A protein has these predicted regions:
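Conserved, mostly hydrophobic/aromatic
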Residues: 60, 136, 188, 228, ...
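Bacterial N-terminal signal peptides
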Residues: 5-14
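Bacterial signal peptide processing site
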Residues: 17-20
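Asparagine-centered strand-capping/turn motif at beta-strand->loop junctions
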Residues: 334-346, 354
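Substrate-binding cleft of secreted/luminal carbohydrate-active enzymes
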Residues: 233-235, 239-320
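Substrate-binding surface in catalytic domains of secreted glycosidases
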Residues: 145-146, 150-251
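Intrinsically disordered, low-complexity Pro/Gly/Ser/Thr-rich segments with frequent PxxP/GP/PP motifs
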Residues: 360-401
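Chitinase-like catalytic core of GlcNAc-active glycosidases
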Residues: 24-38, 63-190
Length: 414
């Protein structure tokens, strides 16, 4: 692998990012995780009792319903006994989309979402689970923030026994109604990931440390303590043949109809670690903690593993590259790639090289396209390629030479 000195330097800087602080915080950041499941199968329920939790993780924020995203709202019934058994503080969230969430041009309608929250709260109480707070996750149009603030204030008056918090977007920070909104709520979380619409011509990352820090500094000017939401996941952005954005694929979702190109959008753990290092300084004492989106579960393909996530929370570097695998049988070379890291990785381009002979035939699996190049064969990701899941091994293709010769394989771009 090339450029080892640069890579090792980068890892060293990443590892020290949370330790070398001139003015450390008086209180450590607290960590919570969004438990964002639309349904619970037995394996998911069982996994809550059979996992090594990251050090410092104290709270689970559990989805109990969605509305305004389609024709009808949807309740989510979490496994309350299993959640209680984790020993973590439990909060509840509802996701409210803009569709059907506006009662008029200046009337955000939160009634359905708040009903879902109250139902979840009552179910939790009946199951013996104490709820620390409830959160409204609503991407309110910026022009309606003042009206949204009024709805939150009214909800608090009608439901005084709960702590009511809201999620917020960086684009709201300069809006006139933003101060009213965060003053109306009992707490607020600033989302720092997936804040830009994907663009095939001008790729934008899922998360960028420098940009996130700028938003945090803007938010601190309001003088109110808050939390920030950071990503553990990856999205696959989908585009038409003309480059029009069609949506994103997360986990098991199908590609949107008409998808001709995809763009991988992973959360970069190195950038997340660097931001954690910044937030360890007491200058950012208004940032109380991190709300991680989202808690990993067995079978996740586009999410960090529990072990990888724990590394990031501990400000340790996570490996970032997959490894090529070559199996040679005479003149036949089979190529695969292996992801031994704790994060999903974009499918790589793979080069197979040899000397003193030529390729008789070659072929790629459906996720790659084979073409001659560099004195050998290059397997490039298919335009619809996605991610290599943590722990996954995937066959790339094969090359048959006219005669047996030594063969080399490497990942391009490393």
């Amino acid at each position: 692998m090339r450029r080892w000195p640069v890579l090792l330097l980068g890892l060293a800087l990443g590892a020290s990012g949370c330790r070398e602080q001139a003015a450390p915080r008086s209180a450590s950041l607290t960590h919570a995780a969004y438990v964002w499941r639309q349904g619970w199968d037995p394996a998911a329920v069982a996994s809550l009792a059979d996992r090594a939790w990251p050090a410092g993780l104290t709270e689970l924020n559990v989805l109990v319903g969605e509305c305004g995203l389609g024709v009808a709202g949807r309740r989510v019934v979490p496994p309350w006994p299993a959640l209680r058994g984790t020993g973590k503080t439990v909060s509840l969230s509802v996701r409210i989309g803009t569709r059907q969430a506006l009662g008029g041009p200046a009337e955000p309608d939160l009634a359905e979402g708040l009903t879902l929250l109250r139902q979840g709260w009552e179910e939790a109480r009946a199951a013996g689970v104490t709820i620390a707070s409830v959160q409204v996750d609503f991407d309110c149009p910026s022009r309606l923030l003042s009206a949204y603030a009024d709805r939150i204030a009214a909800a608090k008056r009608a439901w005084p026994e709960v702590r009511l918090t809201v999620t917020t977007l960086p684009t709201w920070l300069k809006e006139p109604g933003f101060g009213r909104l965060i003053a109306a709520a009992d707490g607020w979380t600033l989302q720092l990931h997936a804040t830009h619409r994907p663009n095939l011509a001008k790729p934008v990352p899922l998360f960028a440390e420098a940009e996130a820090l700028g938003w945090i500094e803007q938010a601190e000017m309001f003088g109110r303590p808050f939390r920030v939401a950071l990503p553990t996941y990856a999205y696959l952005a989908c585009f038409s043949s003309s480059g029009a954005y069609l949506g994103v694929r997360a986990e098991s979702a199908e590609l949107p109809k008409g998808t001709a190109r995809t763009q991988v959008l992973p959360a970069d753990p190195a950038q997340v670690v660097r931001l954690l290092g910044r937030l360890a300084d007491r200058r950012h004492a208004l940032v109380l903690g991190i709300d991680w989106f989202r808690l990993p579960f067995p079978g996740d393909r586009q999410n960090w593993t529990m072990a990888g996530w724990s590394q990031v929370i501990a400000c340790q570097p996570m490996p970032t590259a997959c490894s090529p695998e070559l199996r040679v049988d005479g003149a036949l070379a089979d190529i695969a790639v292996v992801n031994a890291t704790g994060q999903p990785l974009p499918l790589p381009a793979v080069e197979v090289a040899w000397r003193g002979t030529r390729a008789l035939a070659a072929d790629a699996t459906t996720d790659w396209v084979a073409s001659p190049g560099g004195g050998g064969m290059i397997f490039r990701p298919h335009p619809l390629a996605g991610f290599l899941a943590p722990g996954e091994r995937r066959v790339v293709g094969w090359v048959r030479l006219t005669e047996t010769r030594p063969v080399e394989v490497r990942i391009l771009g490393e």
